A protein has these predicted regions:
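Positively charged n-region of N-terminal signal peptides that target proteins for export
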Residues: 1-5
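N-terminal signal peptide c-region/cleavage motif recognized by signal peptidases
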Residues: 11-15
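Acidic, low-complexity, intrinsically disordered peripheral segments
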Residues: 17-19, 30, 66, 75, ...
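Periplasmic alpha-helical coiled-coil/stalk elements that build and connect Gram-negative outer-membrane
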Residues: 24, 165-169, 175-295, 416, ...
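A glycine-/polar-enriched beta->alpha junction
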Residues: 31, 35-41, 48-65, 101-128, ...
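Amphipathic alpha-helical coiled-coil segments
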Residues: 42-57, 181, 185-205, 222, ...
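Small/polar, glycine/serine/threonine/aspartate-rich low-complexity segments that form flexible
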Residues: 69-148, 277-286, 318, 331-373, ...
């Protein structure tokens, strides 16, 4: 029996060692969340996506080199041959081609392009003539082509530059969203941290309450043995003990629940055992509401984001107007072509003949100037412009509303901080008085001046005051954190949090 007990104790010890507890301060929790949480990873991926979207459009202004290889390209098919004054015949034709093409395209700053291109391939041709009893003809040819081409849209906006501007605005918005997301993470970690702290303190308060009720029950039994109180008083004290045990068990379960929520919030494995370290001391600071509003309007990224959104809508208006504008295009090309054909399939001879033909054959060349204008579209273009302008006006209204909302939020949070600060001082004093009052009640109970039921009420009152102080403390800390988030300003140090967040 003793050996079994020893084994059980050893197993419990090993289990406890394996489940090492990680103690976290608030600063450590924030640091983990800003690197490991789902939210920051999601914001990072979104920012990376927009950054690459911007880099893609930026790269549109750089040259590109393209190569296509078709080796082999083979096909056989029936081809209809129409004959004058006779019925058509259907010949079977086939080709086997091997080669490729290479092109170099230089993007002009004006949105056009200048391209150099070359094509070279060898092809074996076959034809089965229906009119000659499907007599088979074969030929081998080599084809070479070198040329230059030019294309330039005119009388319209540079769409490449416009797309780049749009991508840049989108990237700036994603960067702002990432920065705001960091501040939101800090605030949410603050909420989660103090929610876990509340659950931890509730366990401690309920443990203290249970110890007090056990002590009251012990004293009641001694009084009963001395025949100083009735047995009913002891039963009441015993009921208080059992009720406090139930409350303690419930608060322990709630603490574990809050631990899991907090671990998920900051990005820790749910299997990891954690506990928090906090200092319940708090400091106060002066808040100038005018400075708070000024800094919020300067630092809050929602205003910049609204301005970027307005610029995107301006681009939409320009695009809508182009549906009905005069457009033009200039294109030109010049190339030389060489063709070598012979029955001998010798590749070297074929290409020598093709290269010689480059100088013999006249070049291909051309230039085209086109204009297009929608004369009448039955209101489609006009409606699209009206839609884009309405969305632009809505974006302007949204920016104005955001500025008003920021001012209102700052005024409200400044009031909340001041109110919670005063309330915290009151509850702190109440807690000191309640502790003193309960100690006096314990002495009165020991002296027989009050009943166990009256002592239980005093104990309940002490717990309520302790929880009220805890809630007031947490409310104040959350209000201060919300003030930081909504002003992006450190009132203690007199500096902007925006610089600190961007440096990270």
């Amino acid at each position: 029996m003793k050996f079994g007990i020893i084994i059980i104790l050893l197993l419990q010890f090993v289990f406890c060692v394996a489940q090492d507890t990680v103690f976290l301060t608030f600063e450590q929790a924030v640091s983990i969340a800003l690197n490991e949480s789902y939210t920051i990873k999601s914001h990072t991926e979104n920012k990376t996506a927009m950054q690459n979207y911007f880099m893609y459009h930026k790269a549109q202004f750089k040259p590109r080199l393209d190569f296509n290889l078709y080796s082999p390209s083979w096909n056989e098919s029936v081809t209809q041959i129409n004959r004058p004054d006779s019925l058509p015949v259907f010949n079977s034709t086939g080709s086997l081609r091997g080669g490729g093409d290479l092109s170099f395209t230089y993007i002009l700053p004006t949105g056009g392009n200048l391209a150099l291109h070359s094509i070279i391939y060898q092809e074996q041709l076959t034809t089965n003539l229906e009119s000659q009893g499907y007599n088979k003809l074969t030929a081998n040819q080599a084809y070479t082509k070198f040329g230059i081409s030019f294309n330039q849209p005119i009388f319209t906006k540079n769409t490449l530059r416009e797309n780049l501007q749009e991508a840049e605005y989108q990237y700036q918005r994603s960067s702002n969203y990432y920065t705001r997301g960091q501040m939101d993470i800090v605030y949410n970690v603050t909420k989660g941290f103090y929610a876990l702290y509340r659950a931890t303190r509730e366990v401690e308060i309920n443990k203290e309450k249970l110890e007090n009720s056990k002590e009251a029950y012990r004293i009641a039994r001694l009084k009963l043995e001395a025949k100083r109180i009735a047995e009913a008083e002891v039963l009441i004290a015993e009921v208080e003990v059992e009720q406090d045990k139930a409350r303690l068990s419930e608060s322990i379960s709630n603490k574990e629940r809050e631990k899991d929520i907090f671990k998920q919030l900051i990005g820790l494995n749910l299997e990891k055992n954690i506990d928090i370290i906090t200092n319940i001391m708090y400091d106060t600071f002066a808040i100038d509401i005018n400075i708070a509003i000024e800094q919020a309007l300067t630092n809050r990224l929602e205003i910049e984001d609204a301005e970027l959104y307005k610029k995107l809508r301006e681009i939409d208006v320009d695009r809508a107007k182009r549906e009905r504008e005069l457009k033009g295009n200039i294109s030109a090309y010049y190339d030389i072509t060489g063709l070598g054909m012979m029955n001998d399939p010798n590749t070297a001879d074929l290409f020598n003949k093709s290269f010689s033909n480059l100088t013999e054959r006249p070049p291909n060349r051309g230039i085209t100037f086109t204009l297009s204008y929608p004369i009448h579209d039955w209101g489609r273009g006009k409606a699209k412009v009206a839609q884009a302008k309405a969305e632009l006006r809505d974006a302007e209204l949204e920016k104005e509303n955001i500025q008003t909302t920021i001012v209102r939020e700052v005024r409200d949070i400044v009031r909340t901080v001041k109110e919670s600060q005063e309330r915290l001082k009151i509850y702190e004093k109440n807690q000191e008085l309640a502790i003193t009052s309960y100690k006096v009640s314990q002495l009165r109970f020991e002296n027989g001046d009050i009943t166990s039921q009256e002592l239980g009420k005093e104990q309940e009152r002490l717990s309520e005051v302790q929880l009220a102080y805890l809630n007031a403390y947490i409310t104040y800390q959350l209000a201060v954190a919300d003030l930081k988030r909504k002003t992006m300003w450190d009132f203690r140090e007199g500096r902007s949090y925006l610089i600190e967040v961007n440096s990270e």
